[in-house]
Every structure is written in structure tokens, then in C-alpha cells.
């Protein structure tokens, strides 16, 4: 079967950026930035994104482009005879399934809130207790949560079943274009609110006092973690898009564009959140409470809040759904390569698997609310811990070692693939950094995540 390919470079960049851009860009990056010295944190973040995130991104893409296959088969095509690197391909796919076990539920929350604002469920005069109660009611109703999760899964696999160009690429182009327009409109509106500039200053102006209080080591560690996790590396989520790429552009050049889009959305998200919260005297927090309690409380007290709430949750829906369909594509491509299934068969069978696997997360907030797993975490946080703290860093380390050691694919073959085409080239002089320093940085992140 002839390997599918992207219709355009723009399609590849927007699909890949859509995979990287997700909920964490909005509910984590702005908060961590504000708490860790503003502009100083952003500077360290950008340094680590270039020094850590971009190299590993090019490695995943290189494995995909050189092999023209999905996770397991890509290792088999490139590894030396008798070696076992392909075992990680199976682990990477497990990571993709596990990520979707909870990400589909959270993406469903975004869709639910878009329709809640559209219907006018959130009205002026509501306070933080009211918006908290509304979110609590959603979590307490397994049928409602399951409905929105099912909507997300069914729509996601419907998109992917239509093929790479007519499904994933076409929908991602539309969603990412709309997302970028929405984020600019929302940020401009937020910045023009009364008292909003104080929020902008807190968010982006370098704050040496905050850095001194927190400690420069902690700021650097936070920046390193954010830069590493933002691209969702380690579970072959990016590798699959490398397998659909052409050879006309270098991987560092294309990877830099993906990083730039991801960073733009993360920084702009803060320009929506901080000015609005400062304008209405609301304390900024992180995670689900920021998105589903704090910000709705801001919107309901804002002139035209129903419209702005709709636009924000449309943006969040696109941000989360772009990740969902990107990972679904990876899961389907794996099934097509490994078992010879058609796209429709891969979509149907994997759709059923993901629906069943997502049930524990849905029930974890109500029927199974007393169930605590890893370190006392609830179901969603336990699944997230497995993916974010174990599979992503370990997977990134495996891709790195595969690409730069003589026991794997090898540094020279990786560099030749990465530098094929026009654009930004990776210097061969970086070999010692890739072989000795970068693995230690990833190992540090892995150990930090377990402490």
C-alpha cells in the first residue's frame, strides 16, 4: 500500500503544531510563568525548548521520515538485525492509548462548556461558588460526562477515517487557523480591559524579586520541565507525521516552526488570562479550576461575557481536539501498518477500544470517586502520571539513544536524514552534546517527576 503524504508543508506544520498545542498550553504555562518570574522564566523556557525540545523533536521526525512507517515498524526498519529497539514502539503506542483514556474526557469538558455558554447557562451575577458548583455538577453526572466523551471520540475517529489529506489535514488546517484567529481576538479584548496592564506586567515583565524568593534553581527546573513536556515527545505522536513528510525541507527548520507556533499559543494564552483576571480582581490559578471555575467567573461579570465565554471555549475545544485527532491518527496508522486493516476498520475497532478505556476516567469523579491509585491520586491524575512522568521522558530518552548511539540507528544516519532538504541544518559538532549532555538532562527530568 502506497504511503499517504501531506498535501502541503503548511498541512504538516499545522497538524504537528496541533498535536503539540493542547490544554497544558493554557492551563499550565501562563500560571507557571507568572509564578516563576515572568519574562525570566520565558527566557529560560525558550533556551531549553531550543536545546532540548527541538533536538528530540527532530529525532522523532527523522525516524518517521526515514522509515515511512508507524511506531513499531519504524524501529524494525531502521534498527540493526537482532536488536530490540522496536519494543519501545509498542510501549509508545501504549502511551498513546493511555493518553486518550483521559484526554478525550477533558476535551469533552471543553465542548460541554462551549454549549453551556452558548445556551446561556452562565449568567451575570454568578460568583466563584456558583461557577465551582456548575463544574462540580458536571463531574458528578457520569451520563453527561460520558456523552461529551463519546462525542469527542466519535467525531475524532470520523475525521481520521476520511484519510490523511481529506480528514486530519483538512480539519486541522481549519481548526488551527481558527484557533490562531480566536486567540488573537481574545487576547486583544483582554488587554483592553480596565486595569489589564497590571496583569500583563505580572505575567511578562521580569520579576527578580520572585526569582530570588523561589530560587533560580527552581525557576530553571520549572522552565526545563515546561519546555520538555510541551511538545508531547516520547510516544511517537510526532514520529507518525515524519512518516508522511516530504524530503524537501530539513527537520530542524520544520521543527522550529512547530515550536514557534506552540510557544505563540502558550504565551498568548497568558495574555487572555492574566489581564482579564487582574481586571476583575480574580486570583489566577492553574489546572481545571482555572479553566472551568476562575475564567467562567470572569466571563459572567464581563460585558458580552456570554459571547467571550463561547469564543474562549471554542478556542479550547480546537486546542484539545487537534491533539485528539493527531493521536488518533497515530493509533490508526499503527493498526493499519501492523495488521493490514483498512482505515474504516482501524477507526471502528480503535474507537470501541478508546470508548471502553475512557470509562474509568469518566467514573473517577463520581461512581469511583473514592478510588485512589498511584500515590493517592484519582483516576485521571494516575493516568496522567503514567504518561507524563514515565512514558514521555523514558520514550524521549529511547528515541535520543536510538538516534545518536552506534547500538541504535546511529548519529550519522540521523544527521543525514535531519539535514536532507533546504533550511536550518544541525551541526555534526553537536554530537558530544547529543550523546552525553542531553541524555542527562532528560534523565534529570525523569527523576524530578518521580520525587
Which ranges hold each PLM region?
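Inter-helical loop and helix-membrane interface segments of multi-pass membrane transporters/permeases
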Residues: 3-4, 32-36, 66-91, 104-165, ...
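Helix-loop-helix connectors at the membrane interface of multi-pass transporters/channels
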Residues: 3, 73, 107-140, 242-248, ...
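Membrane-embedded translocation segments of transport machinery
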Residues: 2-6, 169, 173-321, 325, ...
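Transmembrane helix-boundary motif of multi-pass solute transporters/channels
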Residues: 11-48, 236-242, 253-256, 260-261, ...
